A protein has these predicted regions:
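Bacterial lipoprotein signal-peptidase II cleavage site
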Residues: 23-34, 38
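A ligand-binding cleft/hinge motif common to bilobed small-molecule-binding domains
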Residues: 107-111, 240-259, 309
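Extracellular/periplasmic bilobal clamshell ligand-binding domains
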Residues: 322-359
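N-terminal secretory signal peptides and thylakoid transit peptides that target proteins
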Residues: 1-19
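Periplasmic-binding protein-like
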Residues: 152, 213-216, 222-223, 256-281
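Early extracytoplasmic/lumenal segment of secretory-pathway proteins
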Residues: 38-110
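Extracytoplasmic ligand-binding site segments that recognize negatively charged/polar headgroups
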Residues: 48, 55-56, 97-237
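Mature extracytoplasmic/periplasmic domains
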Residues: 270, 275, 280-337
Length: 359
């Protein structure tokens, strides 16, 4: 059994959902942290859809960075197949039409390294002035290519009017919670994959499939991704869903039944899923991309990313504000797998899960 890694500091992960990403932060216009210089041209940034658009972290970063660099335009692209698009392009010898990738997790980085002969990304940690401010427990790449910018904790969200927090993994398989849980497909969904890895950390590579068979016997619902799963939960199709421990950051205030947005940790744990950014090795604007990455690690940007992405900052000493801190929950025992632990294992775990459980 692979050793599981416990994080001792807060972190962040991608929400990966349109609803949560629309949570707006402060309307600050401080451009100092974005740097200055003689840059001009276009920075092409590949990311996920909910990072861009009105009131999102991406739109705020673009506005502030362009104001600090009048000759620069930041353009976002949202590849339908995510990182897989760029893995396939490199395998086929096609041009990588982006400078920077935002939204990379550990499992995706491992997959890219396993499937490609040459690295898709460039080492940058020694080139960034703020790279050493990232919390040490969040680092996902031993080669310094992928730099975390936020982290989330995968947990349960449950309706306290209907059920109590199960508190343990074993409780989820009991008759008391039969038919009560909605999860996501681990092959298609970031939170679904994180929850699968959490069960592997708890039950071990030799026991996790038996645990999932017990979940199936207890009528767990498996849906394709976070959004349909959360929508089903909000439509009262089941009183529990795998989601994020920052749920109440978005869902609180007048008219909101906060009991429907209770955060549940299993065995006092949640799965930490840091989200990272990485410079493509064949980037057309590498220096501009590095400057943008440093800006994303600045305290002002980190606070905005936390609130707008509804995730925890990746950098030490950042305060997202009292409201965020009141409603964002951190587990006493975060758990995750490291790059080395996932390397050579994660794809097999997912394929076995697909074959034995999802089918």
């Amino acid at each position: 059994m692979k050793r599981r890694t416990f994080l001792r500091t807060a972190g962040a992960s991608v929400v990966g959902a349109t609803a949560l990403a629309g949570c707006a932060g402060n309307d600050g216009t401080d451009t100092e942290s974005a740097g200055t210089g003689g840059f001009s041209g276009t920075l092409q940034v590949a990311t996920y859809s909910s990072f861009t658009g009105k009131d999102t972290a991406g739109n705020w970063l673009k506005s502030i960075f362009e104001a600090a660099h009048p000759g620069v335009t930041v353009e976002f692209t949202t590849p339908e197949s995510g990182l897989n698009q760029y893995i396939l392009r490199q395998q086929n010898g096609a041009e990588i039409d982006a400078d920077l990738y935002i939204g990379l997790n550990t499992a995706e980085l491992v997959r890219a390294d396993q499937e490609l002969d040459e690295s898709l990304f460039e080492t940058v940690d020694e080139d960034l002035t703020r790279a050493d401010t990232v919390k040490s427990g969040l680092q996902i790449d031993p080669d310094g290519r992928a730099i975390p910018y936020d982290t989330g904790y995968i947990s349960l969200v449950y309706n306290g009017n209907e059920v109590e927090n199960p508190a343990t993994f074993d409780a989820l398989t009991s008759e008391e919670y039969q038919g009560d849980l909605i999860v996501q497909d681990a092959g298609n969904s970031d939170p679904g994959r994180a929850f699968l890895l959490w069960t592997i950390a708890e039950k071990g590579p030799d026991g996790y499939l038996d645990y999932w068979r017990d979940l199936l016997d207890n009528d767990v619902t498996i849906l394709s991704d976070w959004e349909p799963a959360y929508n089903a939960y909000m439509n009262d199709e089941a009183p529990m869903v795998v989601s994020y421990s920052t749920d109440q950051v978005y869902y609180h205030g007048e008219g909101v039944d906060i009991q429907k947005h209770q955060v549940g940790f299993l065995n006092d744990q949640a799965y930490a899923n840091p989200e990272a950014m990485a410079l493509f090795a064949d980037a057309d604007a590498p220096d501009l991309a590095r400057t943008f990455m440093d800006f994303m690690l600045s305290p002002v940007a980190q606070a905005e990313i936390a609130v707008r992405n509804v995730q925890f900052p990746a950098v030490e000493g950042v305060d997202p504000g009292a409201e965020f801190s009141q409603y964002a929950y951190e587990p006493s025992e975060p758990v995750t797998f490291s790059y080395d632990e996932l390397s050579g294992n994660v794809e097999g775990w997912i394929e076995d899960w697909r074959r034995e459980i999802a089918n």
